[in-house]
Amino acid sequence: MKTLIENVNIINLEEVETNQNILIEDNVIKEISSSKIKANANVIDGEDNYLLPGFIDCHAHIFAKGFHKEENMANPLGLHFYNAVPHALQTINAGVTTIRDCGSADLSFKLAQQRKLFIAPKIQLSISPLVMTGGHFDLFLPSGWDMEIIYPGFPKGRCDGVEEVLKKTREMKRAGADFIKVMASGGVLTTNSSPEFAQFNKKELKTIVKEASANDMKVSAHCHSLKGMNNCIDAGFSSIEHGTFIDKKTACKMVKNNVSLVPTLLVHQFLYENGFPAWDNYASEKVAKLKEIVKVHKENISVAYDEGVNILMGTDSGVIPHGHNLEELTHLVEIGMSESQAIAAGTVKAAEFLNKDNLGLVKENYIADLILVNSNPLDDVSILSDNDNILNVFQDGVLVK
């Protein structure tokens, strides 16, 4: 199968190559030329439009629908899986062709995407995050009921002590994980859990990293806490998710140790502005936590950016509705990034972090994961927040929007 996009403007980082012709053959960008390309192909007129790499969301939860686990207890388990189908389409329609799922998706989704059973982003899996007893996302209720979903092929993540975290790391690998996610601080959505408190001890964290590294897997930390971030950096983690209370000293330490930051600025702002369902008995507690986080998050991430921390685009989609992914780019610009740097955080920089050396740029011999938009996001990246401005999405050379 061949597709020819004619007279299109190509965006790679800060560069705009005008009036280019691009031949896509099978799943690869075969040729880029300013001259006409002769080919027996489906032709798309790209005049006055802009072609970018498909975006990579480095922090998503494709199965999640607000993480209202009470609904999972009330509904048939099958709905948990079927929800992922519209979530996947919403993600594609937002211009995201690859996601890094930080907890909830299983191997079945990855296989279904690879087999093209439905339109969906490519995915890197963490399966279930590792969480200590009483920690963030330990879903035990005061009643004693456990809301954590488990089924064959999807192990629980709760673990304590060196031996248990070692075994759970191996179980996630066995279940199909591409990387390991660890809840290394308290969070907003879990009651009786403060974002400022570190979770898991240093021996546990180092054990997780040692075992993951032996399997060529990176380890990622949900972490708001300053102490928690330092524990994770010392243990050898590859990324910090959220990083709310980061300071200059810790940012410098991240740079020195090549630790990336996925700030997910969108999620806290979105939740703070839109609130929680009326039936959520813990809504007031969550809003109080959000108030503290929103107050300092952007300011602190701006410090991290100024110190040279490698910042990647991630949204926590699933905690908030899917399909808002590229709104994160506007928040990245607000912390000091240029439009091109924000775009790079969700394309070439994200691809490098995922060890995908053939993604993230519009270049010959790269995988044809691409989006066509109706105006230049280097002038105003917020145009990517409106999914109507994303005219076409290609994944592996196939037109999926």
Outline where the language-model segments fall.
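N-terminal metal-binding scaffold of metallo-dependent hydrolase/deaminase domains
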Residues: M1-K38, N49-L51, P377-L384, V398-L399
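C-terminal cap of metal-dependent C-N hydrolases
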Residues: V8, G346-V348, E364-K401
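Active-site environment of divalent metal-dependent phosphoester hydrolases
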Residues: F63-K65, I99-F109, F140-L141, G186-T190, ...
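His/Asp/Glu-enriched, well-ordered alpha-helical/loop segment
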Residues: N75, A214, W279-E285, K291-N376
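Divalent metal-dependent hydrolysis catalytic cores, especially in the metallo-beta-lactamase
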Residues: N83-F109, A120-P129, K173, A177-T190, ...
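Histidine/acidic residue-rich metal-binding segments in metalloenzymes
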Residues: E164-L261, K291-I311
